[in-house]
Structure formats: structure tokens, C-alpha cells
């Protein structure tokens, strides 16, 4: 007989690889993860055939988030938030390049991997080599960005690791500047919009001021995520709060799978938005190609 979910521990699980570090509790994983996603098929399989346009994904390379209480949360990019949108993009015909800030391997929250979801697992296996040997973002900026770049979109997946480094990176700022100046898409979800904070780094005003976004609700990181042991403590800062201070408009205060398009910025509120955000990105990119 399977264990009753209410008997599962709400205490975060120690990560023995690091001092005072913790994975989410068994109970929180029973609430937040599942063996399958809501993937319901690809809408535009093979629709893009020219081979020029690609997606640049900026992945997280740091696993640990230091919290207010001195504990560390053992995290990474959320596999559903990364791989399900990319499944839609890759199946439509767009190639994907992976970059991290230093060129170190991307980190994933494998405890959130939907192990029975063929779309996610297939995409993970296709990208595994690139995830382990990504490009260095500074090299991409130097050699592959510019008005004639082959990248049509920049994708920043979520997972709490997105709040480490990516949110205060000059290279991320340069990448976002390039996307805005060259009319390319910026696609991100859940905690990934923390990367948008880099756009306002050392500036009086963010170029994204006035944009509307979906983001993971601060109220969950301050409340339920701690209460059920998903996080082992409070974050030092909150994504939606700081985005609001930079003049962006956060349109959600809950987690429903909502997505939003504001100009070329495409956002989703949580892992629940992964499937629809992938569809939205494909539709918008195909429309942009047709109109070029």
C-alpha cells in the first residue's frame, strides 16, 4: 500500500553534497511534482524548415541559493519549465543553443523530472550534451550576437537557481539589450523573470519599464513554500517585488498556468505554464518569420 500523502514529512531533505543545504521535503514534492505534464501535442511539427533561426537558452549553472537563515536551497533549472517549452520549439524546427554565465554545466532539479513524460524526457536526452557542455554567454555575445544573429529568441527557464547570478549579470544585460534593440523575443517563466532584473543593472531606468509580466507569486515563496518544506527558509529577496520596483507590471498574484505576451516579451507564471508558453513562443516566432 502506498504511503498516505499526509504522512509524508514536511521537513526539507538534507543534501549531503553541501553544508547546511536541503532539497524540498517529501510532502512538497508530492504536491508540486508529477510523473507526467499536461503536454497535449505539438501544434506546428516541422513548420519551420529554413534552418537559420535558433533559440538561445540561458541556463543556470549554480545549484545553491543562500537563504536568510544561512541554509542553502539545492535547486537548479526546473526540468518542465526548461524542457517542455523547448520541446515545442524544437519540434517546430528551431535549433537550440545552451549558454551559462561561465560555461559551466547547466544544473537541473532532477527531483522535479516527470519521468513518464515522453515529450520532456526525449527533449532532455537530445539536449543532455549541450547542457553538460554549454557555451559561455560572454563568448556568445562576442561572436554570435549582432543585427545579423541567427537567434530569434532568448529563453530563460525558471527554477529558483534563476535568482543566483543571472539576475545581476552584465552579460545577461547585454543579451537582453541586444534582443530589445534587434526585435527578438525574450521568453521566460516562473522564477526565470529574475533575469529581467539585469536589464536595469546600474541604470536609472530599466528598458523593460512598463512591460507586463507573469512571474511566480512572491506570496508562495513567503508562505506555502516554507510551510510545506519546499524551501528551507526565506529568500533574501523576491522576484516580483524587485521587478515591480524596476517599473514592470506583474499581472498575477497566483499560480494558474497563465501566460502573457507584451510586445516581444513572453512570460508564464509557473511550471503549469510550460506547455502553453511553448505553444505561444512557437506561434509568435513563426508569425514573425512570415512577416520578415
Swiss-Prot record:
Q: In terms of one coarse class, where is the protein primarily found?
A: cytoplasm
Q: Which BP terms does GO give this entry? A: DNA repair; methylglyoxal catabolic process to D-lactate via S-lactoyl-glutathione; protein repair
Gene3D superfamilies per UniProt: 3.40.50.880
Localization, UniProt = Cytoplasm
- Stored CDD domains: GATase1_EcHsp31_like
Q: Where is the active site?
A: 190
Q: Where is the composition biased (Polar residues)?
A: 1-12
In the Enzyme Commission scheme, what number(s) does this protein have? 3.1.2.-, 3.5.1.-, 3.5.1.124
Q: Where is this region: Disordered?
A: 1-23
Q: Name one GO molecular function term.
A: thiolester hydrolase activity
Q: Which Pfam families match?
A: DJ-1_PfpI
Instruction: Enumerate the InterPro entries for this protein.
Output: Class_I_gatase-like (IPR029062), DJ-1/PfpI (IPR002818), HchA (IPR017283), Prot/Nucl_acid_deglycase (IPR050325)
What are its GO cellular component terms? Answer: cytoplasm
Alphabetically sorted, this entry's keywords are:
Cytoplasm, DNA damage, DNA repair, Hydrolase, Stress response
UniProt function note: Protein and nucleotide deglycase that catalyzes the deglycation of the Maillard adducts formed between amino groups of proteins or nucleotides and reactive carbonyl groups of glyoxals. Thus, functions as a protein deglycase that repairs methylglyoxal- and glyoxal-glycated proteins, and releases repaired proteins and lactate or glycolate, respectively. Deglycates cysteine, arginine and lysine residues in proteins, and thus reactivates these proteins by reversing glycation by glyoxals.
Family according to the record:
Belongs to the peptidase C56 family. HchA subfamily.
Protein name, as recorded: Protein/nucleic acid deglycase HchA
What gene makes this protein?
hchA
Amino acid at each position: 500500500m502506498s504511503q498516505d500523502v499526509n504522512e509524508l514529512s514536511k521537513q526539507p531533505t538534507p543534501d549531503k553534497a553541501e553544508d547546511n543545504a536541503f532539497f524540498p521535503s517529501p510532502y512538497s514534492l508530492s504536491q508540486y511534482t508529477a510523473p507526467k505534464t499536461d503536454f497535449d501535442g505539438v501544434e506546428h511539427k516541422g513548420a519551420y524548415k529554413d534552418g537559420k533561426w535558433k533559440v538561445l537558452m540561458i541556463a543556470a549553472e549554480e545549484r545553491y541559493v543562500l537563504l536568510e537563515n544561512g541554509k542553502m536551497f539545492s535547486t537548479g533549472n526546473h526540468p518542465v519549465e526548461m524542457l517542455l517549452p523547448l520541446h515545442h520549439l524544437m519540434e517546430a524546427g528551431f535549433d537550440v543553443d545552451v549558454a551559462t554565465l561561465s560555461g559551466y554545466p547547466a544544473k537541473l532539479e532532477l527531483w522535479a523530472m516527470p519521468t513518464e513524460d515522453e515529450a520532456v524526457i526525449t527533449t532532455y536526452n537530445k539536449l543532455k550534451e549541450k547542457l553538460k557542455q554549454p557555451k559561455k554567454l560572454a563568448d556568445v555575445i562576442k561572436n554570435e550576437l549582432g543585427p545579423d544573429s541567427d537567434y530569434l529568441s532568448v529563453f530563460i527557464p525558471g527554477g529558483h537557481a534563476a535568482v543566483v547570478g543571472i539576475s545581476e549579470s552584465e552579460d545577461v544585460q547585454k543579451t537582453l539589450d541586444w534582443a530589445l534593440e534587434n526585435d527578438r523575443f525574450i521568453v521566460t517563466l516562473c522564477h526565470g523573470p529574475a533575469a529581467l532584473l539585469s536589464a536595469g543593472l546600474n541604470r536609472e531606468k530599466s528598458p523593460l519599464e512598463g512591460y507586463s509580466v507573469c512571474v511566480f507569486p512572491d506570496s508562495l515563496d513567503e508562505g506555502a513554500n516554507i510551510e510545506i518544506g519546499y524551501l528551507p527558509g526565506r529568500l533574501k529577496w523576491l522576484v516580483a517585488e524587485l521587478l515591480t520596483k524596476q517599473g514592470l507590471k506583474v499581472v498575477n498574484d497566483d499560480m494558474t498556468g497563465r501566460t502573457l505576451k507584451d510586445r516581444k516579451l513572453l512570460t508564464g507564471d509557473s511550471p503549469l505554464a510550460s506547455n502553453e508558453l511553448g505553444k505561444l513562443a512557437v506561434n509568435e516566432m513563426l508569425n514573425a518569420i512570415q512577416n520578415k
